[in-house]
Amino acid sequence: MVSLLLISLILTSCKEWDEHYDAGSAVEGSATATIWENITANSNLSQFAALVQKAGYAELLKSTQTVTVWAPLNDTFDYEALMNESNETLRKEFVQNHIARNNYPASGRVETSISMLNLKHLVFEGNGNYTMDGIAVAQPNVASLNGVLHTINGKLQFRSNILESLNNKDFPIDSISDFVHSYDVLRLNESKSTPGPVVDGQLTYLDSVFDDYNLLCQNYAYINREDSNYSMVVPSNEAWTKAMDYIKKCYNYVNFSYFDKPSSKGTNQTQERVTLSPSPEYWNDSISHDKMLTGLFYNNNLFDNKKLMKWAEGEQPQIDSLMTTWYDRIYTEDAEQMLKATTPVKKSNGVMFVTGDSLHLQPWLFWNPIINVEAEFGSNLAAVENGSDRTERVTAETQNPLVPGSVSNQGYVTVSPNTNMSNVELNFYLRGARSTTYVLYGVFVPANITNRFIPQEDIKPNQVQVQIGMNRANGSLPANPTTLTRTDTIGYDDEGKPITKIVNLFTNDPSKVDTVCFGEITFPICYYGMAGSPYLRVLSRVPVGNTEFDRTVRIDRFFLLPKELDAYMKQHPDYKVHY
């Protein structure tokens, strides 16, 4: 049984806890009325009073809690439209947007960012004449028993944050909106609730305050917080569907069997079984959605992400790289391609970049990445037959300057034969392979990588056969691994058609650190996140008595390039791949 590290998920404030605030003392001044009494006594605030009453906030303005209210005068806003809104919308987007806890008088020079009841941050400023979020104050400082009342010449604009904007209908984004909001939950806030008696061993509450949280925000980005600053790439419904169709094909999970230490001799090999709980379908759905979201969130305060705000304002400064909230990077070409196909929309806590009919993210960036296998890592090497392995180190200082190329991670594995007639076998795990088509490459290291004095006649190529052990589509294991072949073009006929040959034995160029293509391989099932994996078998194929090839094999690494990336790199030779 394999356990999945399921995403831990959390929660944004839902019920007002008004009664938990209390004004320490009445505001000094000659006024003896509450804010509510002052509002209802002013005929120019009758529309605002009616909306406050409808939303259920009159009691707050009558209470001893200290608040400041910016009340729009009659006919300076669309009263009828607001009266037709639901109480929930009216409370959050209008009434709470005009009330703040504590006293905020207009006196002298003022420049204050104020957190309103709905947690939106609005700027109150001026010196003699005052504005609230750009709206002129008509009459400041109507002193009241429980705070301050300012009248203003218009409604304060409600600015949605990114999470709230996933609810609106300005764009066709129902798919991602429905998915994100399916993780909205309520949680009791014990510290803000009033404890009651213990009943049947359980603590009850006289006054329960709940917080509403979105469980995805904890794991990806706090797009629900007003004090945060994020960018979110928001796929349209069409873009979401296209991307999810692609992703789900790459994460085709089934129950399967695998060998823990694969080798042709089966020296220490045992067969194990992976059974997915609760089901393979659950894994396909949950992992696919996770991969879909991974590349959509960016903290605007980090690194070159800061330039996203300039993109939102219509500028397009070059971006060296963007870093997601999962610390994955995408670089200049890919980042700018993604952004240029979007419509930026500024929000109270960042920016939404809404896509058109496609999410212009290259699939190998987040969904179907390169699989890199460092040969010198002991955890990657499953088994060696007919020889012994050792890890070698090479740095820029120790590398032979006459050998072009470089060794990744400053290390490689050397496998030496047991006898001068042995052909060695190396078996490697291909962990994390997706259910997709790859082009497999191997990087060979020459014998003189750190020794420039090795005689030239002793620097020979390897000749190897390459096999892949993988499952069938139903998860069963075939009797034998698949032998890879590569189709090479060796010329052209009189009509210009290519003449090809099939290569099943691969050789390297020993004059350099050489990357060799072994051909394509398609995995029917996905191994991402699994204990078991397919394996790569490299078999030295040097005939008896042959002196042309080296029986000692030196491997830097192997990498599986998604077929689309391999083709893209051939069409765009200047494209930079980071792996």
Give names to the regions the model predicted:
Residues 14-579:
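Mature, structured domains of secreted/extracytosolic soluble proteins
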Residues 1-14:
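Sec-dependent bacterial lipoprotein signal peptides
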